[in-house]
Amino acid sequence: MEVLREKVEEEEEAEREEAAEWAEWARMEKMMRPVEVRKEEITLKQETLRDLEKKLSEIQITVSAELPAFTKDTIDISKLPISYKTNTPKEEHLLQVADNFSRQYSHLCPDRVPLFLHPLNECEVPKFVSTTLRPTLMPYPELYNWDSCAQFVSDFLTMVPLPDPLKPPSHLYSSTTVLKYQKGNCFDFSTLLCSMLIGSGYDAYCVNGYGSLDLCHMDLTREVCPLTVKPKETIKKEEKVLPKKYTIKPPRDLCSRFEQEQEVKKQQEIRAQEKKRLREEEERLMEAEKAKPDALHGLRVHSWVLVLSGKREVPENFFIDPFTGHSYSTQDEHFLGIESLWNHKNYWINMQDCWNCCKDLIFDLGDPVRWEYMLLGTDKSQLSLTEEDDSGINDEDDVENLGKEDEDKSFDMPHSWVEQIEISPEAFETRCPNGKKVIQYKRAKLEKWAPYLNSNGLVSRLTTYEDLQCTNILEIKEWYQNREDMLELKHINKTTDLKTDYFKPGHPQALRVHSYKSMQPEMDRVIEFYETARVDGLMKREETPRTMTEYYQGRPDFLSYRHASFGPRVKKLTLSSAESNPRPIVKITERFFRNPAKPAEEDVAERVFLVAEERIQLRYHCREDHITASKREFLRRTEVDSKGNKIIMTPDMCISFEVEPMEHTKKLLYQYEAMMHLKREEKLSRHQVWESELEVLEILKLREEEEAAHTLTISIYDTKRNEKSKEYREAMERMMHEEHLRQVETQLDYLAPFLAQLPPGEKLTCWQAVRLKDECLSDFKQRLINKANLIQARFEKETQELQKKQQWYQENQVTLTPEDEDLYLSYCSQAMFRIRILEQRLNRHKELAPLKYLALEEKLYKDPRLGELQKIFA
């Protein structure tokens, strides 16, 4: 505190000198002016003060009444541990140190606000803020990084505003209480998030400072939703191709240079006007979106988390707003100033000026000039002393005394009084309060749900709007989880009415993306597949009412592309479909990758089947260092004419262009065999196109069934939702219960009441054994009869009551209301159910009673206590 004290003393001395000069000048001026002027001046000052009071009274601090309240009265403290209700001696000592530190700070910095050191907890016990932090590493891998931790805290808790936006809260609850009630203010959010980040290995601190209105109220209506920001596309630099020496020179440009210059000027003027229009439109939108001036700007208290660089490979310092879970630069304008910050080891006061928000702050906590610490012996090392300062500490005795003095002043932070922070798997999965949360962004609305809360697996929906009032919808994005059809994302463009479904690997049809406007067949659609999961290597299929294009990869025949053009369907009386009445194929175009096993002049690059014109066109791959490729065209004719005569292959039926005609001359037989092979290939290609049409119909039918059922998958390890596992567990419990009842029944001693009538230790005679057996069987028989009579009595009672109710209904049927009739029908249904159950129990009892009687008789014969019976029946 020495540097702080010297600085404050210098400022006080300068203020006293300035005040003395001002008082002397005012006294001289007062003596020189007349009395009337001084009276008028006093009147003006009073009017100015009244005007100022009036303006200040108009400033109202409003707190939204819709936000939920979270006070100590709503917290059950009866089950909290003793550490929440009392302080240890070490904690009491720490509070005394904090009070002393606060008194010195208030004395040396009277213009600064009081420090936020030891607010009350939920049990009305003062606790130091550093001991409220409980560093905890969560058992979930998803919460190991700062971004997932911040997003979890933002989703899990509900924001509660500060009671007074100009002051820190009087209470700071434990993280366990905040997690239990899922509510808290910014300080509660920061405490929980900081505890999780420190437990994960980050150098994190809770900050007490000042924020903007949007930051304090969690108002994101002027923020762009992160999900709408498209990633920047990396622009690949085109490599300049060096011109070859013997390239063909381009033809001379005969266009007028003057006309070209005039056209360039005209285009520049058009671009300038368009740029001006866009700039004016942007300024107009910015003016409309501009926030209204805040009367309390710079005074609103807020708490957030500071993460310093170094640990966990953090490259630079940054802020985390716990309300939203978003990260911000330390230069961001939303953060207007810092009063203090703390972690689980120490407490620091910011001694730097925040006139330029937090942009000029240096977060070197080891610098006591910029950051005044409360406790010695922290993990932040002090700055190294300069040579001038170090020259005065050369004496070894002084160094030893200095070390002893520091040791005496050091004080270790007590352990946290908060219990271990725990998040149950159910709470971690549910995340949002009641399983749902809605966040309003600029021209966007984000809705979140817990998994399995919606029957269709919907977990998130992003709706983007055209205007700031969020009335005209542009597009909707819906994210799904645990879908049996592997649906992951559904994108709906309201402008074009285009729907796009994205799937994870594992769909029965290996779907990756399905874009469509209508689920009706033979409409515009694009279907992408996971080609590695398909036998044919199909990557993408594009369909229009008249065409179908398919892209392949990794096929053994090197097919890469197939395009089919269709003609109008022939009209029939019955309903037409792709299976019963397929569309006539007009043209099929197929392209192939290069087959290195064949020479280029024999490897087909493209073949076109002109079905309507009965022609087949072939184009082969180019040789290396060639710019043209060989081509052939076959005139496909029927093998016999109208009279049944066989047509002979003629040279005019094959038109060819050879790059090297002297190397290979194809004979007529080769051309005939090639044409026969192409006919077979054409037939096969037409069949594959027909199969593709049928596959599209099958996919559409399957997608309609999947959307109607929207079945969700449940892990075998999820015993809470897995019905099969639940049924098996209940069956095992039922079997164990029945086994327990059987064991109890076998251990039941029927002879005990009758043996108690005899003197203890007396040996039974033959006559006594027979008498005990008969009495026991007679008693058991009577119990069976009584049980049957009881069931019969209940059966007759229920039957009589039902008959009375039916008779009452017959008598009052005309005057009954519909509600009375519903009650009567409900009663009859329940009564019939009870009567049926009693009848079944009575019949079952009648069947089992003789068996139970015989089982008891056999058990008595084998009882060693009635051994005389065995001698009689031996």
UniProtKB/Swiss-Prot annotation:
<dbReference type="GO" id="GO:0007288">
    <property type="term" value="P:sperm axoneme assembly"/>
</dbReference>
<keyword id="KW-0175">Coiled coil</keyword>
<dbReference type="GO" id="GO:0005856">
    <property type="term" value="C:cytoskeleton"/>
</dbReference>
<keyword id="KW-0282">Flagellum</keyword>
<dbReference type="InterPro" id="IPR056292">
    <property type="entry name" value="DRC7_C"/>
</dbReference>
<feature type="coiled-coil region">
    <location>
        <begin position="688"/>
        <end position="711"/>
    </location>
</feature>
<keyword id="KW-0744">Spermatogenesis</keyword>
<feature type="compositionally biased region" description="Basic and acidic residues">
    <location>
        <begin position="401"/>
        <end position="410"/>
    </location>
</feature>
<dbReference type="Pfam" id="PF24667">
    <property type="entry name" value="MORN_DRC7"/>
</dbReference>
<feature type="coiled-coil region">
    <location>
        <begin position="1"/>
        <end position="67"/>
    </location>
</feature>
<protein>
    <recommendedName>
        <fullName>Dynein regulatory complex subunit 7</fullName>
    </recommendedName>
</protein>
<dbReference type="GO" id="GO:0031514">
    <property type="term" value="C:motile cilium"/>
</dbReference>
<keyword id="KW-0966">Cell projection</keyword>
<dbReference type="Pfam" id="PF24671">
    <property type="entry name" value="DRC7_C"/>
</dbReference>
<dbReference type="Pfam" id="PF24656">
    <property type="entry name" value="CEPT76_peptidase"/>
</dbReference>
<dbReference type="InterPro" id="IPR038765">
    <property type="entry name" value="Papain-like_cys_pep_sf"/>
</dbReference>
<dbReference type="GO" id="GO:0005737">
    <property type="term" value="C:cytoplasm"/>
</dbReference>
<dbReference type="GO" id="GO:0007283">
    <property type="term" value="P:spermatogenesis"/>
</dbReference>
<comment type="similarity">
    <text>Belongs to the DRC7 family.</text>
</comment>
<dbReference type="InterPro" id="IPR033551">
    <property type="entry name" value="DRC7/lobo"/>
</dbReference>
<keyword id="KW-0969">Cilium</keyword>
<keyword id="KW-0221">Differentiation</keyword>
<dbReference type="InterPro" id="IPR056291">
    <property type="entry name" value="MORN_DRC7"/>
</dbReference>
<feature type="coiled-coil region">
    <location>
        <begin position="257"/>
        <end position="297"/>
    </location>
</feature>
<dbReference type="InterPro" id="IPR056290">
    <property type="entry name" value="CEPT76/DRC7_peptidase-like_dom"/>
</dbReference>
<keyword id="KW-0206">Cytoskeleton</keyword>
<comment type="function">
    <text>Component of the nexin-dynein regulatory complex (N-DRC) a key regulator of ciliary/flagellar motility which maintains the alignment and integrity of the distal axoneme and regulates microtubule sliding in motile axonemes. Involved in the regulation of flagellar motility. Essential for male fertility, sperm head morphogenesis and sperm flagellum formation.</text>
</comment>
<dbReference type="GO" id="GO:0030317">
    <property type="term" value="P:flagellated sperm motility"/>
</dbReference>
<feature type="coiled-coil region">
    <location>
        <begin position="781"/>
        <end position="807"/>
    </location>
</feature>
<comment type="subunit">
    <text>Component of the nexin-dynein regulatory complex (N-DRC). Interacts with TCTE1/DRC5. Interacts with DRC3 and GAS8/DRC4.</text>
</comment>
<feature type="compositionally biased region" description="Acidic residues">
    <location>
        <begin position="386"/>
        <end position="400"/>
    </location>
</feature>
<keyword id="KW-0963">Cytoplasm</keyword>
<feature type="region of interest" description="Disordered">
    <location>
        <begin position="386"/>
        <end position="410"/>
    </location>
</feature>
